Regions:
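Short, charged, amphipathic alpha-helical segments
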Residues: 190-193
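A substrate-binding/cap region within the structured catalytic cores of diverse enzymes
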Residues: 1-32, 36
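Active-site microenvironment of metallo-dependent hydrolases
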Residues: 203
């Protein structure tokens, strides 16, 4: 939602369908439906809301604790309730109302307790680019992967644009070692794969 008109990463770039949940729901519903007709999977973003922020998470830490409100959840709630969303992307924003320690992408409270349990989302949760500075300047690769996966993220995004390129082998090896050391549950990985496989069957 385009809440903060001075927001330079979402609002001034025209990356939102409107200022109100009514506008966002109306126009994004049309967009999602047309994509579906073309067998294209749509992704709602950036959960739990980025339109009220004052900073850009590509560049560093973004705190929305004083600007965010629950009305930013309304479009997500609508799409989930009406079973019209296959994927949601997390935001790298920090909100102490939702988690006192971690930004949303790395937060179990946001991605599992709020999104899964409270709102009832059962689709695929994908991270935003994990090399954006809001994450990569504060967490190393092992910490990022462990926290993101354990928070409930099913699909990890590395764009290799903002930081030193990371290979798939590095990611897989790191996750594998964390499973062996019982820092990540194998069941969590299996469940994530099941969600992704289920999504791909819809194409």
């Amino acid at each position: 939602m385009a809440i903060n008109k001075e927001n330079k990463v979402i609002v001034t770039r025209g990356r939102s369908f409107g200022e109100s949940s009514k506008e966002v729901i109306k126009y994004s519903s049309i967009f999602v439906e047309e994509l579906k007709k073309q067998h294209v999977i749509s992704v709602l973003k950036h959960f739990p809301g980025h339109g009220s922020s004052l900073a850009d998470s590509h560049l560093g830490f973004v705190d929305i604790s004083k600007t965010w409100s629950e009305k930013e959840l309304e479009p997500y709630r609508h799409f989930i309730k009406n079973n019209k969303v296959d994927m949601i992307m997390s935001a790298h924003v920090f909100n102490d109302k939702l988690d006192k320690e971690y930004p949303a992408t790395l937060s179990h409270n946001v991605n599992t307790n709020l999104l899964r349990y409270k709102l009832g989302f059962d689709g695929v949760l994908v991270s935003d680019d994990l090399q954006m500075y809001a994450i990569s300047k504060h967490y190393n690769l092992k910490e990022t992967l462990t926290l993101a996966i354990n928070s409930g993220v099913n699909m990890l995004l590395f764009a290799n644009q903002l930081a030193k390129p990371i290979t798939l082998d590095e990611i897989v090896d790191t996750v594998y070692k964390q499973i062996l050391s019982e820092q990540i549950s194998l069941e969590t990985i299996i469940n994530a794969n099941k969600r992704i496989d289920s999504l791909l069957q819809k194409l």
